[in-house]
Every structure is written in C-alpha cells, then in structure tokens.
C-alpha cells in the first residue's frame, strides 16, 4: 500500500511561460527507494520540493497516508546536497537540533542523536566540530539529522553530488544499509546514471519542458546489495550494464529531442 501518493501533479512558477511539471502520477510505499533522474529542465528538484511541502502544486494533489501535504513537516525528512549544518555547534548538537526545536528533552534527544550517529558509522564523533569533518562525514551528519526526527519518508536532493567518486560510492552503500535497517521509504533525485540504477527499486526517468514521466523502471540492484551481494559484483553484472546503457540512451534521447525543438 502506498504511503505517499502524487495524483496528476502539475506545477508552474509565477511569471513562467510554461509549467515545470505536468501530469505526474507517482506512489511511494514501504521498502521502496524511488529515484528520479532526468536532464536539466525535467523538474527533479521541483518534484522533491512539492513532496517536501516547500511549494504547492498548481494542479493535482499530494497525500501522505491519505492526508493532503500542505507544507513542510517532520514526517518528511530532507537531506540536501548542501548539508546546511550549523558550524558553531558540534556534531551531536547538529543531529539533535530538530528534536530540540520540537521540545524534546535533552537526555532523550542526545540519546536519539547518538543512535543515529552510530547508524551512519559516526559513533564517537559527537563532540567534533563541523569544520573538522570531511565532505562525506558532513553528509553522514546531515543524514543522521534527518533520521533523528523519525520521519515517515526520507527525501534526498542530489545528496552526493558534491562528493568525490570514492566517497560517493561509500555514501551510496551506506544509504542502502540505512534504508535496509530503518525500512523507511526514500525519494532521491540525482543526475548520476550509475548511482540511479544502483540505488533504485523504482527509477523514474523524467523528460523536460514540462517535466513529465517518460519511463518507470523496476530494479533490484539496490536490494541485492542490501542482501549482501558486493557492489563490484552487481556493477559488473551484464544486466546492470545493459540497464545503465538503456537509461543513458533514454536520457540522451530526451536531451537531444529538447535541443531540436
């Protein structure tokens, strides 16, 4: 059963000549990791902002467990490419920040924060300052902070886009481990094709101007990693390579078609 439902969603920014999204129908349920991929102008970030409640659709409706999404909520945790951490606070305070705003007592919020730091392999980092962390460690803190509030779903806006290739792969693998352990549905947007194919249980390919769903693929590579198969074995699987090439051709076709319009 779907937890999150998007029905015939359309969106257009004030003053824009054309809509940014049109007729988007999507659902996200338990044990799903839904990835949206597409060229510039396909509305990936706008779609995430709609689900997060940062902007409102021009048409259609978005519901979480049957209740309309009217604005931001702790039920939808968000991880951004820019981690937006508080540099004057230590790691523990950053992870516990949302809980503090929600009025959670100090002992409870710090206990929860330490649990989330352990989940993202940062146990013992609670007193570190943000400036002492690498880019990958900062993203782990951002992920722990989003999870600390125990959201119903996790939204991720190109979370690994600014990382080097090695750290990006580490973070992809960590995300799959966290996804398996928490069983939280994840909606992630990316511009990286191999990342999308590796992570997704459901991969939505978006076409641009206006953003719309061109193709919806059901994949199992991320589940295979979560079940214990190595990333190297998965990425050398001929079926993975074939899927990656299919997605690359689809994205390239959409981009070429747009340039010819």
Curated annotation (Swiss-Prot):
Principal place of residence: membrane
PANTHER family: TAURINE IMPORT ATP-BINDING PROTEIN TAUB (PTHR42788:SF18), TAURINE IMPORT ATP-BINDING PROTEIN-RELATED (PTHR42788)
Similarity annotation: Belongs to the ABC transporter superfamily. Taurine importer (TC 3.A.1.17.1) family.
Signal peptide: none
Organism: Pseudomonas savastanoi pv. phaseolicola (strain 1448A / Race 6) (Pseudomonas syringae pv. phaseolicola (strain 1448A / Race 6))
Known EC number: 7.6.2.7
UniProt enzyme class: translocase
Binding partners and assembly: The complex is composed of two ATP-binding proteins (TauB), two transmembrane proteins (TauC) and a solute-binding protein (TauA).
Reactions catalysed according to its record: taurine(out) + ATP + H2O = taurine(in) + ADP + phosphate + H(+)
Domain ABC transporter: 4-233
Name the record gives this protein: Taurine import ATP-binding protein TauB
Localization: Cell inner membrane
Pfam family, one: ABC_tran
Keywords for this protein: ATP-binding, Cell inner membrane, Cell membrane, Membrane, Nucleotide-binding, Translocase, Transport
Keyword Glycoprotein: no
MF annotations from Gene Ontology: ABC-type taurine transporter transporter activity; ATP binding; ATP hydrolysis activity
């Amino acid at each position: 059963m779907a937890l999150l439902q998007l029905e015939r969603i359309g969106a257009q920014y004030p003053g824009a000549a054309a809509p940014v999204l049109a007729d988007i129908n999507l659902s996200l349920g338990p044990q799903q990791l839904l990835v949206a991929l597409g060229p510039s102008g396909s509305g990936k970030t706008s779609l995430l902002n709609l689900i997060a409640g940062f902007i409102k659709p021009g048409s259609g409706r978005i519901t979480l467990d049957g209740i309309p999404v009217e604005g931001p909520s702790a039920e939808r945790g968000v991880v951004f490419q820019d981690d937006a951490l508080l540099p004057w606070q230590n790691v523990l305070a950053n992870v516990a920040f949302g809980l503090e705003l929600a009025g959670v007592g100090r002992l409870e919020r710090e206990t929860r924060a330490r649990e989330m730091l352990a989940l993202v392999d940062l146990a013992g980092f609670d007193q570190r300052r943000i400036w002492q962390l690498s880019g990958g460690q900062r993203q782990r803190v951002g992920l722990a902070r989003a999870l600390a509030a125990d959201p119903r779903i996790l939204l991720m806006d190109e979370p690994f886009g600014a990382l080097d290739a090695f750290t990006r792969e580490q973070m992809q693998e960590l995300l799959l481990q966290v996804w398996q352990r928490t069983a939280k549905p994840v909606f992630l947007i990316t511009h990286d094709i191999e990342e999308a194919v590796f992570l997704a249980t459901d991969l939505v390919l978006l076409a641009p101007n206006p953003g719309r769903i061109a193709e919806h693929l059901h994949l199992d590579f991320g589940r295979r990693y979560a079940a214990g198969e190595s990333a190297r074995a998965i990425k050398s699987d001929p079926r993975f390579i074939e899927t990656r090439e299919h997605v690359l051709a689809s994205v390239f076709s959409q981009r070429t078609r747009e340039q010819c319009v």
